[in-house]
Curated annotation (Swiss-Prot):
One of its GO terms (biological process) is ribosomal small subunit biogenesis. Its EC number is 3.6.1.-. Residues 1-113 are annotated as: Necessary for association with the ribosome and for stimulation of GTPase activity by 30S ribosomes. Has 3 domains; an N-terminal OB-like domain (about residues 1-100), a central, circularly permutated GTPase module (residues 104-270) and the C-terminal zinc-finger domain (residues 280 to 350). The C-terminal domain has 2 regions; the zinc-binding domain (residues 287-319) is required for binding to 30S ribosomes while the extreme C-terminus (residues 320-350) helps remove RbfA from the mature 30S subunit. This is Small ribosomal subunit biogenesis GTPase RsgA. Its cofactor is Zn(2+). NCBIfam families: PRK12288.1, ribosome small subunit-dependent GTPase A. The gene is rsgA.
């Protein structure tokens, strides 16, 4: 994946924030090694400021401080940590995270002040949760898929609330989902209310670390509750009977274990992936069905719109590429341009 470009104003803010954090870290006292036991392996199940909850190999969770030399630590990181010893006055000292293992993957999102910010590590797959209520939006699904392709993390599309569909509605939704099945994406139809379709989803989650992405109101948290066998541990984003709007809730990112095997990181930071930091070429690459036609256009600088000799547009006209995907591709590019214009205007004020 090519390196994302930041504007001069954004880069100044990133550098300023980094220097501020360095200054703060130098002012913090170091930790006495005599306060801690032998090094052990663990996984970060949650991060709270300068502390992290680390789960050891035996399943116990330990609240730990973080060495100031560690620049980045997020939920899902595999770490070397040391338990705290009982202090003289009988109070246990917090453990300490000593080092972070190399990540197999990292889930990031653009941040206006800190550049591209990591929010979870060592993710195997992203579960894109959509629903027929409050709205089945293929545009939002396509935005998530572009993010997954750019991050090089495997996606699974899960359509929730199928219990609200009659036969005609189910046929229509299946036709819409065939657009994604036909280009190689896995689609699962489920209901967190009736638990229909949960078994295939459980099988897809077993043995992997997943993260669920979905806008408020699609039943993401209710689905997680059903999979985890919980009732209230994860707050729900239910649909209001009167308004049809999702009731917004947030919690800190945390790793949970599925009873059937596998793990999930629940984070409010993946409700929507921002794409404004990407280049147009990265968006194009994020549409997998475009790949066979890239480089075949008449002009090298083809915008894949009304340009003469555009191989991608011709494939759309021939029915080889879904028209809805092509339209959403241009909607994403247009929304990116609008956001970048606003942010560049803001940068001129710095």
């Amino acid at each position: 994946m090519s390196k994302n470009k930041l504007s001069k104003g954004q880069q100044r803010r990133v550098n300023a924030n980094h220097q501020r954090r360095l200054k703060t870290s130098k002012e913090k006292p170091d930790y006495d090694d005599n306060l801690f036991g032998e090094p052990d392996e663990g996984i970060v199940i949650s991060r709270f400021g300068m502390h992290a909850d680390v789960e050891s190999a035996d399943g116990d969770v330990h609240r730990c401080n973080i060495r100031r030399t560690i620049r980045s630590l997020v939920t899902g990181d595999r770490v070397v940590w040391r338990p705290g010893k009982p202090a003289a006055e009988g109070v246990n000292v917090k453990g300490i995270v000593e080092a972070v293992h190399e990540r197999t993957s990292v889930l990031t999102r653009p941040d206006f002040y800190d550049g591209v910010k990591p929010i979870a590590a060592n993710i195997d797959q992203i579960v894109i949760v959509s629903a027929i209520l409050p709205e089945l939006s293929l545009n939002i699904i396509d935005r998530y898929l572009v993010a997954c392709e750019t991050l090089q993390i495997e996606p699974i599309i899960v359509l929730n609330k199928i219990d609200l569909l009659d036969d005609e509605g189910m046929a229509f939704v299946n036709e819409q989902m065939d657009i994604y099945r036909n280009i190689g994406y896995r689609v699962l139809m489920v209901s967190s209310h009736t638990q229909d379709g949960l078994k295939p989803l459980e099988e897809a989650l077993t043995g992997r670390i997943s993260i669920f992405a979905g806008q408020s109101g699609v039943g993401k948290s209710s689905l997680l509750n059903a999979l985890l066998g919980l009732q209230k541990e994860i707050l729900t984003n239910d649909i209001s009977d009167n308004s049809g709007l999702g009731q917004h809730t947030t919690t800190a990112a945390r790793l949970y274990h599925f009873p059937h095997g596998g793990d999930v990181i629940d984070s409010p930071g993946v409700r929507e992936f921002g794409l404004w930091h990407l280049e147009p070429e990265q968006i194009t690459q994020g549409f997998v069905e475009f790949h066979d036609y890239l480089g075949l256009c008449k002009y090298r600088d083809c915008k894949h719109d009304t340009d003469p000799g555009c191989a991608i547009r011709e494939a759309v006209e021939e029915g080889k590429i879904a028209e809805t995907r092509f339209e959403n591709y241009h909607r994403i590019l247009e929304s990116m341009a609008q956001v970048k214009t606003r942010k560049n205007f803001s940068d001129t004020d710095d």
